[in-house]
A protein has these predicted regions:
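Extracytoplasmic/lumenal domain signature
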Residues: 1-42, 46, 63-219, 224-473
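Short glycine/Trp-rich loop-beta-loop segment that forms part of the substrate-binding cleft
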Residues: 53
Length: 473
């Protein structure tokens, strides 16, 4: 597998929107940086080779959150079993924005050494569901038996985030955090790494970084792992991009595992108007590069080997979603994203875009009138008008469509709700739209039958889980 190289077009030169940048390596600012091992994501189709959904949206391209195919007979959803969470500080419960369960089909020899129940150990092709909760716990379920596969990990602080597991098969869990305090307790905040043989935390990387220019420290986005160099990659609300050379040591015969991370961070300041530090969304990755946007609306392609921006552009409004990438047979690589009204207290056009991931050029922008209605009360609570959910890259019968869920849209009759838009990947023209009756920040999930028939599953702020026809909406 050979990934293409990226190089900025004239319109996407980093110096046009970035005022300065810096790299922290070994705890010190350095003038130049080069990773000790080549960090390159490799074939994205092999990320989930062991089976399952191992990170937010399935893999480094962040295209979907499903694995395998489905057989649909009745086109209805039903609850098989519900699992209750507890309540933390009489405030936090359930699963927050950006919280997606993982599904891990463990290798048999790994499963047998872990502290899961005997019933789950004996389940053929056992699939474990792992989901952190805002009640301060990380839950583990057996997807087949619908029972707990092992005890919850108790952190005691809100972790309504999406975790990730090591794609190489190592029994490692990487978990961020969205808050550091309750009314009675202030703890640590950052990235936790757990040994899933015994569920013990074996490393903690703080996000209270002296070099950070942002005022918040949450690590809400899900990390990804580049297996070749054993590198963990993630962003934080403090405005930094982190890479951790994990130096994992796994003794299969003795069932022991350890890590010895070396942290590197990339930060920057912007020259655009109203620049503010903060990263809400996570990274997508292709080849040597990671792609992410910030709360100002600066979208960057950063080389993981040099920790320098290859290209950067200003979207004009906040980018709060994790972008999606798509590779094409001719070598083209494209990025899909959208904006949210996080900078301005007004109503404005929401931008839905396709961008050349190798140059930073805008390929198209949706021309449909999508007016987001800014609401200060909702924004203060972290819910913004626009694209907070990650787009769904269509496959099967909808392989020509890109699906966006846009929150808090003002319709022609002045009513406000989320709207799902299906756009043509080539032109950006609207193929169909489906207004919901409430707001929604849920990233749509694509389900496909063997014949390519498509369905979309997504939730909303009213607590409804919807099944939609992917072809017609």
């Amino acid at each position: 597998y050979r990934a293409e190289k990226a190089s900025a077009s004239e319109s996407a030169l980093p110096e046009k929107v970035l005022k300065s940048s810096f790299v922290i390596s070994g705890g010190q600012k350095v003038d130049t940086y080069a990773s000790s091992e080549t960090v390159s994501m490799g074939d994205p189709n092999k990320y989930s080779a062991q089976g399952g959904v191992l990170t937010f949206r399935g893999g480094p391209l962040r295209q979907n959150a499903a694995y395998g195919t489905v057989e649909v007979t009745e086109e209805q959803l039903s609850v098989v079993r519900g699992m209750r969470t507890s309540r933390l500080d009489n405030t936090y419960t359930g699963f927050g924005f950006g919280s997606q369960p993982l599904i891990v089909k463990w290798y048999k020899n790994i499963r047998e050494m872990m502290n899961i129940t005997d019933e789950s150990k004996n389940t053929t092709a056992m699939k474990e569901v792992i989901v952190p909760s805002d009640d301060g716990k990380i839950y583990f379920y057996d997807l087949d038996t619908k029972a707990y596969s092992r005890p919850a990990i108790e952190i005691g602080l809100p972790v309504g985030v999406t975790a990730s597991v090591n794609p190489y098969g190592y029994p490692l869990l990487y978990v961020g955090q969205n808050a550091e305090a309750t009314s009675a307790y202030t703890g640590i905040i950052g990235m936790r790494i757990y040994n899933l043989i015994n569920q013990k935390m074996i490393d903690f990387e703080t996000s209270k970084d002296e070099a950070a220019l942002g005022k918040e420290d949450a690590v809400a986005p899900s990390s990804i792992v580049e297996s070749g160099s054993d590198t963990l990659v993630y962003t934080a609300k403090n405005g930094l991009l982190y890479t951790l050379a994990m130096n994992t040591s796994f003794d299969l015969n003795n069932a022991t595992i350890s890590v010895n991370p070396v942290k590197t961070a990339y930060g920057y300041t912007g020259s655009v108007r109203d620049f503010k530090q903060g990263i809400t969304g996570g990274v997508a990755s292709y080849g040597d590069y990671v792609y992410y946007g910030d709360d100002t609306g600066l979208l960057q392609c950063v080389d993981m080997n040099t920790m320098q921006a290859v290209w950067a552009i200003d979207l004009g409004e906040s980018m709060m979603c994790t972008p999606a990438l798509e590779t094409e047979e001719d070598g083209g690589v494209y990025l899909y994203t959208g904006t949210a009204l996080g900078k301005t207290g007004r109503s404005a056009q929401i931008r839905l875009l396709k961008i050349d991931a190798l140059t930073g050029d805008v390929v198209w922008e949706c021309q449909s009138a999508i007016k987001g209605k800014y609401a200060s009360k909702e924004a203060k609570a972290g819910s913004y008008a626009g694209v907070m959910a990650s787009p769904l890259v269509g496959e099967g019968e909808i392989n020509d469509l890109i699906i966006f869920n846009v929150n808090h849209v003002e319709l022609d009759d002045k009513s406000i709700c989320a709207v799902v838009y299906a756009l043509d990947k080539t032109t950006g023209e609207e193929v169909w739209n489906q207004p919901l009756d409430v707001d929604s920040k849920s990233s749509p999930i694509g389900l496909y039958q063997r014949d390519g028939k498509s369905y979309i599953v997504m939730g909303d702020d009213g607590g409804t889980l919807r099944l939609m026809d992917g072809f017609s909406g």
